[in-house]
Amino acid sequence: MIGDSSLCLVAGDLFPLRFTGGAEVSVRLPWDHRWHTGLQFTWSHVDDQNFWGGASFDKDTKWYVMKDNLGTMKHTGFRNNPTGGGEVTFDEDLKWITAAGEHWMNEHRIHRIHSLDQNRFAAGRGLWAVDLTTEITNTRGSTIALGSPTTAGREHAGYTGWFWRGPRSWTGCSVTSSTGLSDEAEIMGTEAEWVAFSSEHDDYDGGGTVLVYSGTSTSADAEVPPIKWFTRTGIFAVASPSPAFDQEIHLPADGTLRLNHRFVFIEEVLEGQQLKAIAKEYRLG
């Protein structure tokens, strides 16, 4: 358990994260949201359970309420030993366990860290990428609704799924999407192939760009809405390519949801054609 058990849950996360030059690219246990940890895969609304952390948005009160509903994503083993070298892969199985101890879902999660190029832009100023590929299977025996605070009634709060929390120094950073939008409010809830955040660093000279690809969300067993973006920069920098931004996924018994996303961490402030060229080079698929 991480931190206060009333706020946090056990889940897989990647932390610490750094750019190739050493600057931080994430934060762990920030004072405003103790359950934010680097780059993590979680889910805010799983029927009445919360596999995200903190309070749950309540349909009746129309605000956040602390409940005894924090679930746990329990690592049960690696399918293969984690690899090293030029490409690092973590291939693991997890069980989603409710606050009452019920086993609701199985997950097969793969993190693949790749494309390290330490000197792409200058000595020590390079990039690297990480992919998430995951399959979530309903083991409960009845349909499970996978949603978000927006599906529960809060506008512009559809965060769920793979979630990045940037360092405090990135508050107020610039953001742009592949569709040409360049404001957090404009991008929030939209569909786009990618979103990019850029900022100067604290502690290190220069700046960087975090490039996030929406990827894919598919299921042969349920209707799946398009991935939409949850983005913020004003109070802090966050990004989530949300599979259930404003529409629930009703995953039937034994049904499986498949997700695939990518982050690229770039030790250079990119914009315009340079950003588009990198986005094309490292696109998914």
Give the residues covered by each predicted segment:
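Beta-strand-rich N-terminal accessory domains
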Residues: 1-40, 147, 266-270, 276, ...
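Acidic (Asp/Glu-rich), glycine- and aromatic
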Residues: 2-18, 123-174, 274
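A short, structured loop/turn motif at beta-sheet edges
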Residues: 78-87, 123-126, 201-206, 217-221, ...
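Beta-strand elements of well-folded, non-transmembrane domains
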Residues: 94-98, 111-120, 136-140, 166-170, ...
